[in-house]
Each structure stands twice: as structure tokens, then as C-alpha cells.
A protein has these predicted regions:
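Rossmann-fold cofactor-recognition segment
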Residues: 2-17
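A conserved hydrophobic alpha-helix of the Rossmann-fold in NAD(P)-dependent oxidoreductases
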Residues: 19-20, 148
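Conserved hydrophobic beta-strands of the Rossmann-like cofactor-binding core
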Residues: 28, 32-33, 80
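Catalytic loop of short-chain dehydrogenase/reductase
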Residues: 37-45, 51, 76-132, 139-158
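Ankyrin-repeat alpha-helix packing hotspot
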Residues: 58-59
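A short, exposed helix-loop element centered on a Lys and neighboring polar residues
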Residues: 65-67, 122
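C-terminal helical subdomain
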Residues: 158-199
Length: 200
């Protein structure tokens, strides 16, 4: 059903020139959910020779909010949410491989980028630039999406009866956007609670 209050803009998050143009022309935001995702089978580089997952889901996400902030398009007390993944629990952050990915393996790269998202959010929350904005990371659990099925068919087949549906996956995202409870910027959320981003 058409909604006159909704506007759709198609963006390639790895195309940083396109992101800059969007930020210059966009309206202001109270809520931003950073949820772009892809797991290419083979190494793909953007125009700046950065691996695609890193270029789109880490640098692209950051560049988008950075430019929106520079353009005065993020309102005071806005909430910015990075949708990470439980897959990041599989990986210790490897900064070198983010930018010099010589031996590309799609799942390891995905896990590393998702780990980097969570680490970056922790650091952003400490910066003066973001002091009037709430910045979070979260993971929605394993959700039965077409992207997951295409990228990890064996995992999808093995776990399909335990995967969450879209509504379940979106629950904490929506809650973080709308709750009136006190939220801690820089924290990592799962099922409406702050959890450790590390396995103990």
C-alpha cells in the first residue's frame, strides 16, 4: 500500500560519492538504522579498492552518518543503530584484513566486519561529535532471510527450524527506536537487553 509519508532512495553503500550526494540533498533524521548487508562469494572491490563488505557495511555506514552530521542532517537526541550479527562472535577484530584482504573468505570477512561495527560504535559513543546522539549496536538473532539462504545455504538448511522470522528479528530494532527507557550509548543489545559483545 502506498504511503505518502515514505520516500525510497536506492543507495549503493560502497559508492561513497553517491552517499555524499544523498547527504547533501536529504532531509533531517531522528532515527537511522544501518542494516545494509551482503556476503559476496568472491573478492569484490569498490572504486577505492576497498573490499565490498568493509566498504559498504563498515566504512559506508560510518561515512553516511558522518556526512549527515557534517551537513546538519542528524537531529539532537537522534538514535543511530548499527545492526551487527551473532556471526561477529566467531571473530576477533583483525584490522589489517579489513583493508588488506589478501585471502578473501566470505564468512570470515563478514564476521570481521560485523565485529568492527560493534567496536566502532563503542568508540563513537566516546567522541564529542556524537555526544548529543545515542549510538548503539545490536544483533537480531539468526533470521530466515533470502540473503542468509543464498550466502550460507548449508547453515540455513541445518538451522531453518530455529531461525527467527522477520518480525522477531526486527523486535529489538524497533524497541531501541521507540522505547522511553534509559538507553546507554555505545552498548550492544540483544533481545532488548545489553549483552556482552564477547564470549566468556
Amino acid at each position: 500500500e502506498k504511503n505518502s509519508n515514505l520516500n525510497f532512495h536506492s543507495l549503493d553503500m560502497a559508492n561513497w560519492h553517491q552517499l555524499k550526494d544523498f547527504c547533501n540533498k536529504s532531509n533531517c533524521f531522528d532515527y537511522i538504522v544501518l542494516n545494509a548487508g551482503s556476503i559476496p562469494d568472491n573478492l569484490v572491490l569498490n572504486d577505492f579498492s576497498v573490499e565490498h563488505q568493509c566498504a559498504s557495511q563498515l566504512i559506508g555506514h560510518y561515512y553516511l552518518i558522518y556526512m549527515l552530521k557534517e551537513c546538519g542532517k542528524i537531529n539532537q537526541n537522534a538514535r543511530i543503530m548499527w545492526v551487527s550479527s551473532g556471526g561477529m562472535y566467531l571473530k576477533k577484530l583483525d584490522i589489517d584484513s579489513l583493508f588488506h584482504n589478501q585471502e578473501y573468505e566470505k564468512v570470515a570477512t563478514y564476521s570481521n566486519v560485523k565485529r568492527a561495527q560493534v567496536t566502532l560504535v563503542e568508540e563513537l559513543s566516546k567522541q564529542e561529535r556524537w555526544e548529543n546522539v545515542k549510538v548503539f549496536s545490536m544483533h537480531p538473532g539468526w533470521v530466515a532471510t533470502y540473503g542468509l539462504k543464498e550466502a550460507l545455504p548449508k547453515f540455513f538448511s541445518l538451522m531453518k527450524n530455529r531461525l527467527r522470522n522477520a518480525k522477531e528479528g526486527a523486535d529489538t530494532i524497533i524497541w531501541l527506536l521507540l522505547t522511553e527507557k534509559s538507553l546507554r550509548s555505545g552498548s550492544f543489545y540483544f533481545d532488548r537487553k545489553i549483552v556482552s559483545p564477547y564470549l566468556s
